Amino acid sequence: MAVATSFALPNYSGMLFVKGKHRTPFSTLIGARPMQTNHVEFAVGQTYDAPIGSQPEISETASLTAPEPSFVTRTQNTNVTQIFQETVAVSYGKMSNMGTLSGLNAANQEANPADELAFQIARTMEKIAMQVEYTLINGVYVKANADNVANKTRGILAAIPNSNTIDLQSTPQAPVALTYDTVAEALALIHDQGGDTTDIILGVNATTLLQLNWDARKNNMTIVPASRNVNGLAIDTVITALGTVAVTLIDSLPDGTALLFNPTVCAPVFQPVPEKGNFFLEPLAKTGAADKYQIFGQLGLDHGPSFYHAKITGITTKKPSELSE
């Protein structure tokens, strides 16, 4: 276990800036209605097949005898929570040595942060938040059958069936950029399966967003910046042939993949520990001159009916400047 010590973590002065991708938009967008469970497996809903429209052919004579009864079967869909756990340890020597500064310093400057333990705990919570964001999107489902097997929650991408997937890699023109026509086709898949396209959000990475803006300019489409607010997150909107779609950056998506999801049917599912809560900070037994804590939590994804979402894969990873007109 790595313990924060004086020489391992020198003290510096100056403003602190986080480097790298650290935002969690998917977790934010589905966080309006968090759920709670006391069981590792939980239901994400039931589905049944809608009846197919047809014209009956019943004569007056045939109507004298009632037809055979029929029934509709239902299927339950489930997911699981999984454990997120990290440990933080800072030595007594490090905590008592915050006045020793390394690097370039001016007179009267102080170490930033001033409290190493608080800083390490906060950064560890950021790490867990990024683990949660990645897992809710990319998680591969595993239901444990023994104590030494880890439960793994099913992410939104794995939940989406092939019937709601467009693979651009299989097109004759591959590899191709993402266009709003393709987005409209994905909306059509959701519609044809019986899903609601009213609140759909399109999640893309930075390269794919540039491709969409490039396509919009070529076709005189209008992207309205920050015109919609979902759970405090301002997102852009664009009008397609099948309705208005919100567009937002989601950095945890795999390269070449775009996600259309309905946040109104998704939710994080927490499994709190009695009398402790969830994602709590707890001191661990001392083995020497250091303070040691663990952060523990259990969480899974309620992705709702899978046909309410869609994904587009096989998108080129080239920026518009690298694509031919």
Regions found by a protein language model. Give the residues of each.
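Flexible, glycine/threonine- and acidic-rich loop/arm segments that mediate assembly and lattice contacts
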Residues: M1-T244, D251-P254, P263-E325
